[in-house]
A protein has these predicted regions:
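Acidic, metal-coordinating catalytic cores used for nucleic-acid/nucleotide bond scission
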Residues: 45, 73-79, 229-235
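Short internal beta-strands
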Residues: 66, 93-103
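Metal-dependent catalytic neighborhoods of phosphoester/phosphodiester hydrolases
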Residues: 78-90, 106-117, 236-239
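Metallo-beta-lactamase
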Residues: 65-76, 224-228
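Long, structured stretches of catalytic cores involved in phosphate-ester chemistry, encompassing
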Residues: 102, 218-241
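Core dinuclear metal-dependent hydrolase active-site scaffold
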Residues: 1-64, 135-223, 231
Length: 241
């Protein structure tokens, strides 16, 4: 847990970035007294070498993300993630991703394989890690900060939880020796800031929503980044909320 202090103002900003044909990325900031105190990234995409998430980060004057989540290994959520790892993460960055199934990446795209290779090299290095790399399943607390007014007038929790992927489905698949890739592994996030809650649903699909326990989705949601680009494969989410 980290402590963040402010004197006059505390703001939360979220930028949901969509590209013309495909690809999405999300950037969020905690802003204290008009200065960014915390920067988070969910997924990456770029076109013609231009990454809008990186532009937003650098515009704030910060060089690194505090929090990065790679929700799942599809190109429309991945292109540019290798550059994020190499240039915009440091030893204090909390890097979260979907669970590893195996080290065999043959069935993935070239971009995903390259990103995996970078992650494996960081994990296997005997030297100090470049960043903390963790995998997420439902009901993980991924981050917690206490934002306190130095005048004592207010104290607010900032927390990030994962509600997906489903440990129930992944455990059953592992026991059966079944390997499924893609959206089944997608990380879904809940961000709480004070009394507000934001859902970033990645590409979580119906199969996962069907088995999630109620307490994983018990928060009143103020903002939803809908799952899987609004596809019918994720249409039961409103029924679960």
């Amino acid at each position: 847990m980290r402590n963040i202090f402010f004197e006059h103002s505390l703001k939360f900003e979220i930028d949901v970035i969509g590209y013309k044909n495909k690809g999405e990325s999300i950037v969020f900031f905690l802003i204290t007294d008009e200065k960014v105190s915390y920067a988070g990234l969910v997924d990456s995409y770029e076109e013609d070498g231009e990454n809008e998430a990186v532009k937003l980060l650098l515009k704030t004057g910060r060089q690194y993300f505090d929090f990065v989540c790679w929700t799942h290994p599809h190109d429309d959520h991945t292109i540019g993630m290798d550059r994020i790892l190499e240039q915009y993460c440091n030893q204090d960055t909390a890097f979260w991703m979907f669970p590893f199934y195996s080290k065999n990446t043959d069935g993935y795209s070239q971009m995903v394989r390259h990103t995996y290779k970078n992650l494996f090299s960081i994990i296997e290095s005997p030297k100090r890690k470049k960043m903390k790399i963790r995998t997420a399943i439902n009901a993980n607390r991924m981050e917690r900060c206490i934002c306190s007014c130095i005048a004592g007038a207010g104290r607010y929790n900032f927390e990030v939880f994962s509600f997906a992927p489903s440990s129930e489905i992944l455990t059953a698949n592992m026991v059966r020796g079944q390997e499924e890739r893609g959206n089944l592994y997608s990380v879904g996030l809940l961000i709480n800031i004070g009394a507000y809650c934001i859902m970033l649903a990645g590409d979580v699909e119906n199969r996962t929503f069907q088995v999630l326990p109620d307490y994983d989705l018990e928060f009143p949601i103020d903002y939803i980044k809908i799952p899987h680009h609004g596809s019918s494969s994720s249409e039961i989410l409103p029924d679960r909320l």
